[in-house]
Amino acid sequence: MRPDAASLRQIEASDPGVSTWLSANAGSGKTRVLTDRVARLLLNGTAPAHILCLTYTKAAATEMQNRLFQRLGEWAMLADDRLRAELAKLGLDESPDDEALRRARRLFAHAIETPGGLRIQTIHSFCASLLRRFPLESGVSPNFVELDDRAAALLREEVIEDMAAGSNPLAVARLAALATDQTMPVLAAEIARNRLAMTRPLTDPGDCRALFGLPRGETMAGLLGRTVLPGDAALVADLIPLLRAGSAADQGAADRLAGLALDAPDAEALRALEGVLLYGKTAKAGPYAAKIDAFPTKATRAALGEPRLAALEGLMRRVEAARPLRLSLLAADRTEALHAFAAAFLPEYDRRKEARGALDFDDLIARARHLLTKSDVAQWVLYRLDGGIDHLLVDEAQDTSPDQWAVIRLLTEEFTAGLGARDERRTIFVVGDVKQSIYSFQGADVSTFAAMRADYAGRLAAADDRLAQMTLEHSFRSSQTILDLVDRSLDEPARAQMGDPFRHIAFRDRMPGRVELWPPILPGESAKPENWYDPVDLVSAEDPVARLAREVARRIRALLDEGARIPTPDGSRPLHAGDVLILVRRRSPLFSEIIRACKAERLPIAGADRLKLGAELAVRDLGSLVAFLVTPEDDLALAEALRSPLFALSEGDLFDLAQGRPGTLWDALLAQADRHPRVLAVLHDLRAQTDFLRPFDLVERALTRHEGRARLLARLGPEAEDGIDELLSQALAYERSDVPSLTGFLSWLHTDDVEVKRQGESGGQVVRVMTVHGAKGLEAPLVILPDTADYAPPDRELLLRLDGGPMIWKPRADDAPPAVAAAQAARAAAQERESLRLMYVALTRAQSWLIVAAAGKLKSETSDAPNGRPAWYDRIRAGMEAAGARPDGDGGLVLRDEAW
């Protein structure tokens, strides 16, 4: 049977004799192409050790390896005719003879027996193996350990504390004066992550000032002296009583001016003057222009008199002119403090890691890159590798960072030089999709994808070779209705920001599809809290978010109860809970409310896809118990433990214990031993073991011997199991890294907020709720997107790299000096482009049914939105209208095939 067009395209892309750069749409079967290409390389006689496949995640590497071993295992057991048919599907030019069949059957054993096995691994795993293979050349211990994010964070904090205590207190104090206790660890992490950009720190004040366009010798004192003249303090003093007699706006200005000491002004006084004398960012007169003829009000200006009004306008103009200089000076001071700290911190951080024989994830890439570029050993290392790598495959190339690309490029130098250790033809295969690049926060740079494609094409052409550039347009996942919506929701300006031109074709063109757009739930008046003691961030039942969550849960319940059917390639079947995937952009209140609403409807639900260990109730209950065991005088910890499912005392029981007690809560509990015998039996046993058991053993004793796990799960549900298990894992990790003690374990837990990724439930019949990032690579028959209202993701990065320049400490958007504004605008534009790509990923998870909803502000022609760009909801609505969607009778739209 002749292959269809989609399969022919996959066969062409998997040709092992041609270097290929493949752009693959969502659902187009790129993993199949990768697996086919490796299988064809093995069939051609390439040794497994000469193939290297680099993936983005360990999960992707595992999936690909499992698929490949499954296929090779099946080949080993198939009869001749069936094996010939399977090999024909790979696109082999000739029918395989008996020897080829025997070779295919031996591939499974050959791959299993190869030392090291098939090399399908992440770039970090490869770099780690490279460093272990050449420890002397790379200058690392052959037995180095890899620091996970948590251990690295703890080590950085240890370095900062020791620097502050003795080795370099001035650098820490200077940075701490400009930062907070929350931003210091983040700054240290970003400095470590961007160490290559910090290798030549800007510690010279002149360099920092030149970076921000400041004249040499410019200082804050000089600027203040030129801006606030000797007579200005008296001028403002005369102005204040006139303002107090004026309008409400004048009176507010008087209050702000009254607290200023203009006889000896500082930078904060100048900032306060700007707030009174200058317009804001969006004024018609211009951003931060002087309020000439607008301040004070007309009556107050008349009372002020012409001479003093002229003096006031002169002060306004000087403050206007001083603002960019003030911002530049502050930015220069912050950046100088940043680089002074980095110059002291990075060497000490590296020294501590070396003393422990440890490397963090960034070290793996940096050290491997350095090893492959060292003039004295690089050629030797490349020669040895050249004898080991003939074919390099790169998966998810759009999410590969520039530093990782540098390593990949060095590995393939000989591929494009026409020379090498052997005469075998070498190839590189790269697959990715710019439209799905959504991990910039992990270092991915979408522009590098096109740059490296051009680089390889040029280098191969220079070596009389070629790079085949192909695109997979057929989707094996989604119906044509879904794909048409994807194409139409991205207008021409949006498509231009997504990279190369694209289109989507459904492989199963007859499979029906359906898209629903629910009417948005817009914000109304804020509901007043029902009880004064409710938390300030409690979501009201009438909040748009809560209302939408209930609507989503009710709709799923109704679909399941009425036996709704979904189309499949083999015909329709009843919908079950496992067919439903709910995707949100972030773990906001909507995320939690949807889970709560689904539980209220008694829907089988997997819970959150990720959990923060410190926020889990079961973990907090166990933490309170441990805190009490460490310090019996800690009444709050004991009260929390008693009210938890571990002991299940009621509010009344706790009140009877605590009210009017003369001593500690523990003393009160001992005095009422006859009322709570089980509680005291458990606590006495655990207290007796506190000085003898390690943290893991003590927590496990509470969970198993005293039935703590069963009690927690009975009260909190099975999803609490992940948090409990991770707490035990953290106890073991702590014991491996330090001398175990309960006090140290509590400190370990509270130092960093551990995030745990739950195992996917794609094979179970439960509703899944997760972020779009977490759903990358997943699919579902019914996808619900409730989080499509306007949202401007915050820029959480504290460092900013100027175009072609060094790293600076990013100021707030409103405080950006001219030299920084362009870089910040470029970053904001890049974030908007990534938002479009995130929407693309969300839409393309759906196989046949998509529901879109929104709660909150939208961006339309007549409304304002925080980021000034269309919300996802508006883009999708425009796409549905362009595709011919019809009103559903409830204020929404529906787009569906006639066969639905």
Where in this protein do the model-derived segments appear?
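Conserved motor-region signature of P-loop NTPase helicases/translocases
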Residues: 1-66, 70, 142, 146-150, ...
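Active-site-adjacent bridging/hinge elements
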Residues: 34, 95-102, 129-135, 316-320, ...
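Conserved helicase/translocase P-loop NTPase motor core
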Residues: 120-127, 338-390, 403-407, 411, ...
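Short, solvent-exposed helix-loop connector elements
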Residues: 710-716, 821-835
